[in-house]
Each structure stands twice: as structure tokens, then as C-alpha cells.
């Protein structure tokens, strides 16, 4: 999920198939420059998590990045945190293709997400 979708995928990553079935609703989650995340959503995630984090992000500030990097590993979940220097919130979907740093970040983010999903979907 991108931006607000980050909040959504964290919520989905904490859901069960049903009240009688503890199987997670989704296999894994990946988010780029998430927004609207709260501690409870981070603490309740139950599936492997990937975060693609830009250096400058008014929605995913450093304190929230630090919280994710502290809390998610403590849950015992597979966790992949990718840092993208010199780019801002929205880089993965609204980056400037004419800016070398932004273009490299968009390509790298796409590659990271594709690899993440292939790994977790094929390991089931």
C-alpha cells in the first residue's frame, strides 16, 4: 500500500480469516511511504512486513520510522526496512522520472516489492 494504503495493509496484516480461524487474512504486507499509521496497528501486525521509507516524509516521520524499527522486530516477524535517501513522501508512485535520484528510487522500490511478494507468495 502506498501512503494511506500503508495504514490499510497494516490493518489487513493484523486481521484473521474469521473469529474461528486464526489464519492471517493476508500472507505479507509491503508499504511505501505509509501514512496515518498508529502504534496499535504496528503492534497488531501478524505477517511479514516490508517498509519502503523515503528520507524526507512529513507523514512517516523519523519517530514513527524508529517505532516501526523497534516494534516490528520485537514481534518475531520477518521484516524488511528499505531506506531511500534523497527522496520524499510519494516517491514510489509520483516520483519525477527526469530526476536521477527519484528515478533510481522508483525502480529500486518496485524491485524490492516484487522480490518481497515473490518470496512470500512462493514460500507458501
Regions found by a protein language model. Give the residues of each.
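A short helix->loop->beta-strand "cap" motif at the edges of active sites that frequently abuts
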Residues: 26, 47-48, 75-78
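C-terminal catalytic histidine-bearing segment of alpha/beta-hydrolase fold enzymes
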Residues: 75-124
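Cofactor-binding loop segments of dinucleotide-utilizing enzymes, especially the Rossmann-like FAD-
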Residues: 34, 54-56
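Short beta-strand/loop motif that positions the catalytic acidic residue
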Residues: 45, 50-53, 84
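Primarily recognizes the serine-hydrolase "nucleophile elbow" in alpha/beta-hydrolase
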Residues: 1-44
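Conserved alpha/beta-hydrolase "acid-adjacent" motif
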Residues: 58-67
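A short beta-to-alpha transition loop/helix N-cap that caps and shapes the active-site region
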Residues: 36-41, 59-60, 92
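Conserved hydrophobic residues forming the short capping helix/wall of the S-adenosyl-L-methionine
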Residues: 68-72
